[in-house]
Structure formats: structure tokens, C-alpha cells
Amino acid sequence: MLCGILCALALTTAPMVDRIEEALCARDRLNDAEWSAVPDKAALLEKRAQFKERFRRALGYHAIQRTPLNARSLGVRDYGAFRIEKVLMESAPGEFVAVLVFIPAAGRFAPPYAGFVFIPGHSDNGKAHETYIRTCELGARSGLLSAIYDPLGQGERSQGAGLRCADEHVRIGAYAALLGETTATYMLRDAVRVVDYLASRPDVDSAKIGACGNSGGGTLSAYLMVADDRIRAATPSCYLSSAREHLVPCGPQDSEQNFFDGFSWGFNHAALVLSAGCPVLMNAAAEDVFPVAGSRSTYEIVKTAAARAGMPEGWYELSVAPGPHMMSKIHRERAVAFLLRHLRGEVREVSETENFDFGGDDCTVTPDGEVSRLAGFTSVYEELERKFAAQGVSAEQEARNARGLVIRECGGTDCRDVLATLRGRIVEGERAVLRVGGAAEPGEATATLFAEGPRYVPRTHRSGKLSYYDRRGTDEVVAVDLYMSGRSLVALRAAELLTLAAELRRRTGFAPALVAVGRFATVAKFAVAAQADAFSQTKYLDEPKPFLDALKSRDYLSFADSGALYSGK
């Protein structure tokens, strides 16, 4: 009866979205304060090394296998001022990546070239997005070789689930979380393997490789500059702000941007910049969805820490361009100029004065425009499937792993409010039957678990572009906010079940029976795993498919049902 006693002692305040996010923002402020307080270079290097290693573990960087790239050139086209080589490579066996390599004109620039990887943002057409290929074109016209590729679910890299872009990223993340991974685990691997490919080219100086990206690609280029020491200069655009400045107006973003308990172990935008170990240009936009006020405040922290550490002038820079969230002409020019300065030692203005009018065929690598149609194709879902089978991932296993999370929720302040929703037949001396997830039958009791029905309270104001989770209008915002807090919506609901069980036992003299319907069967399994004697018996009706079966059939598995199950194991 430990859980019931702990819950009875707890204060009662429902974990509204505002309150969860305010706690995350407070932790982000603390992280900023810790970087602001770094006194000297030795302290900065120590803190950088600690964050870098923790971040690499969260990303799964050390688990990236350097399998054969099997890179194949599928043709080169000469555009006069530059050439484009179409390359097909594998970031993992059968996981094809379509790459465009922009090569400077040999008559003007001699190899080996300094180069950079460009990571596209959330565009359905991936590497073919106009502003992204223009960045690579400008780089080639200026003497830099670059490789731009399709991230998962974009361009030619549909994974066969009928989803695109952010929807695919979130779906991958829901499954990856059950393995202690994120979508970023797989997206970073792609970026690292493209750097491997660049470094293997005889026309590239492997000691002079940079990273560039916009929006979601700004996110991944920021991750890459921290994780991969081969990156010698980086220009993330339309991402680096401050986590709290973006979270409040826009809500949690798709899953490659969310880490389990990340704020507690130091995930923070200033940390990304100061832990990179290379020069960084923060490209921001005045009207960005990633608020420019956050970019400016983060840059002030970076400048202060850099000055105390004696970093070279111009090592870190902030550029604010007018206009909205996009890889604008100003961003392109400043990014290429920054890369030229730090990769080639050239200090000069870069102006974009002409562009080639690219057609669809110019940017397509595969014959049918889809890697999924190639012989030997392996989707990321098939890779996840193999891991699920090898590790025996199941609701029962996750419930056992998450026992500590459930007990912690019982001892907190959030689970007791459920008692106010308890209704139905409760008679002293008569065993109660508690039903969750469906309408109570005659003679049964029921209750409303958190973030269900009237107990779902969304953020009071969202002024920015709503996240995927907010747009769905479900409890997924709560689940992701709790996930980032090192908690679990499923574990919280399981704690509420145990609170209800303790109350029903107190009022009737018997442990209640439990009937759990639909996805609440998973919640019930968490509760039983945490306290086996809480219920006299349990019945599961209309259970969801086992995780592995759902993955095989490409069923969507929402964060509320699975991602929130991650136990931090």
C-alpha cells in the first residue's frame, strides 16, 4: 500500500500544460545561468566536455556504425560555374540516401576543396527546396564543395508509411523512444555518414569540413557541430534561439528536438553553441518562429563566456536578417562568407548575383524519385523492428522498466486530483469494479484520468506557429512536455489508478477489480507492475496491438501511447 500512502500525503495541483512548460522554462534559465557563470577557459573546456559527452549519449552518437557507404555516382552535369554530381549512398545497410554534390568549377578553383554538408529543414521536397540548393550553388560559385541530402521522410526518402516530413519524424520518434532513442538518433547518423562520404572524396580536404542547415536542418547542423569533431565551422540558420522562448509560443516541436529529461541534464541552446568546439554563426530572422529575442539573449551568454575564456574575436557571431523563418538570401550570403573565412582563411564579402533555374530532374537522384523503390531498400521502421524483436520491447517490459517513474508520480503532487472525478457505485463492504477508458457499466465506478476529456487543459495562449502536437488537439502536448521533464503521461495515469485503488480500498474494505479499455490497458499494466496487489483482478478489453505488430503494420503509435512510456532505462 506504499503508493496509496504516498499519494494520500501529496498536495493536489493538476499538471496543466502551462505549469509543466513553466517548470521547463525555469530549468532552461538555470542552464543559461550556469553557462553565464563560467569564469575562465579551463572551466569552459571542462563544462563543454561534460555536455558534449552527455549529448552524444542522448543522440546515440557512439552507436553509429561505420558500415560501407557503397557510394555510387549516378552522373555529373556541368552548369558552367559549377557541377552537380548525383550520388546514392547508404547511411546503414539498405538505408539509401540521395545526395547532390555541388562542385566548384575546376578552371577557377583547384581541389582539394574545403566543403560543407547542408541539411535541409522541414520541406516535403527535401534537398530540392529552392533556398537550400541556392545555398549550395552559392558555395560552389565561391569555391566550396557541398553535399546536400534528403533527411528521413523528405524528398526521395519516404519510408513507406504514407507519411511525410514532420509527421514521419514524429512517428519514428514514437517508436524510437521505446528504445531510449529519438528521431535525432537516426537523423544524426545520416548527417555523420554524409560527412564520412565528404571526407572520403579525393577532391575534398577532410580537415576543412563545415556544417550548414536551416530550420529542422539548423537543428541537426547544431547537433552535428557538437557531436562530430570533424566539423570546423558551422552556420545553423533559423533554429538557435532559446528553448524557453520557443516552447511557450509554439509548443514542443517534433521528436528530434525533444530529449527525455533533457533540460535537467543541460540541453540548452547556449550549451550547443559553446560546446561545438568550432566557430559558429547563429543565423536568425527578425520575424522567425524561433524568437529572435531568444537568439539575442543566447548570443549574449555565448559572448560573455567566450570573452572570459579568451576565445578569438569572431569565433561566435550572430546575424539577424529581416523577414520570416527561411534560408533567405542574406542568410545564404553570410553563411558562405563565414564558411570561407573559417575553412579557407578568406575574408571577403559574398554576393548572390545569379542563380541557375533548376528543374525537378536536376535534383532527383533515383530513377523513380523514391529510394523505397530501389532493390535492397531497408526502411528505418524495419531497423526499429529488428531492435524491438532483439530487445523484446513490449508494454509489459516497459511497465516493469517504468516502475520507478510510477512510484515517483505517486509521491508527487499531481496524481491526487483524480479523486475528485471518482463516481459510480462505491459501497462499504462491497468490492468495487473500476473501469477506465470507456463508459462505466451499471454497478461500476469510473474516473477521468489526467489529460482525458475535461481534464485536458491546453496552453492558454499560443502566439507562434503551432507544433505538430498542438495541431492534433490531443493529449500529446502533455505527453511530450512530461517526457522532456523526465516523466511519463502513462506513468502519471498509472499513479492515478493506484490512487483510485487506494481510495476504493479505504471506502469499501476491498481491493477493487479493474477493467481497462483500449489504450488504457497499457496504463493499467504500468499500475499493476508498480503495485501488484492494488487490484483484486484486472481485465483488458480491446487492447492496442502489441508494439511490434503495430510497427510492422505501420500503424501510427502516438506519443501519448508509446513515446511517453520511455522509462529512462
Task: For the regions a language model picked out, list residue spans one by one.
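Alpha/beta-hydrolase-fold serine-hydrolase catalytic core, especially in secreted/extracellular enzymes
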Residues: 11-96, 111, 283-433, 438-444, ...
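Hydrophobic helical h-region of N-terminal Sec-dependent signal peptides
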Residues: 5-7, 11
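Catalytic-domain carbohydrate-binding cleft regions of carbohydrate-active enzymes
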Residues: 212-214, 221-225, 236-244, 269-272, ...
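Alpha-helix capping and helix-loop boundary segments enriched in small/acidic/polar residues
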Residues: 123-134, 167, 175-189, 211-222, ...
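Cap/lid segment of the alpha/beta-hydrolase catalytic domain
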Residues: 108-192, 199-200, 241-250, 438-505, ...
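Loop/turn elements at helix/coil->beta-strand transitions in domains of secreted/extracellular proteins
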Residues: 112-115, 142-145, 205-208, 229-233, ...
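Anion (oxyanion) recognition and catalysis
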Residues: 140-141, 274, 529
